[in-house]
Amino acid sequence: MDLRYLNEKRSGQDGFIRLSADRNDFVRGDGGPIRFWAVGTDAWKFSPEDMDRHCRWLAKLGVNLARLHVTVCNAREGASIMDVKADVIAGAHRFIKAAEENGLYVLISTYYPHFTLPQSWDVAGGGENAEGLLFIDEKVQQAYRHWTREFYTRMNPHTGLANKDDPTVAILQVHNEDSLFFWTAQRLTDPQREKLSQHFTKWLIKKHGSAQEAWDASGTGFKGKDQFDDVPTAGSAVCGSTI
């Protein structure tokens, strides 16, 4: 059975995917309804011929959305923090073309921080895991904006469009499996934990007026039992190893 006919002739042929009027569903560019049947893939690594074959196979199975995992930053030791991986961007460009021709839309995940932080990035805590840093470290935040801009604004030689202007690119995933409420926060290095403590203390003081007033407003349920017991005396909130 070949379900290719269920997909559009070319994805994005009617414009960008958008939300319905009630914001509960997706619709095509012409306003018609669309439901996504999706898979995740690393096919940007394939040869051009295999990309075409892969997308044709997915369309035959009834798939109309491919989630493409591409970590754009260059995390190899020796790279600058602003460096991007040109081969990854080039592979994504070619895959997007293959997807378009088979009626597949693309969801792109450009940042998956489960890698070792290169010393050459000159970020506090280098040599350790990168999880959580996007929420804490200003240098990583600035670099993230640069990586993302590079990926979405470079012209795709196969389509003549930048990714940001290509209706085949339906959904942008800004972050993948990373959070200060995720288990990886337990692996923050001491320098980054100190930065997090400083950020949190500034927020508490802005909200309550002082560290003491923040402490007074926090209730009594866990006082004497957690890592914030030193707020009144230290004047700061210390984020320990089990935040």
Regions found by a protein language model. Name each.
Residues 10-243:
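Active-site mouth of glycoside hydrolases
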Residues 1-13:
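Non-catalytic propeptide/linker segments at domain boundaries
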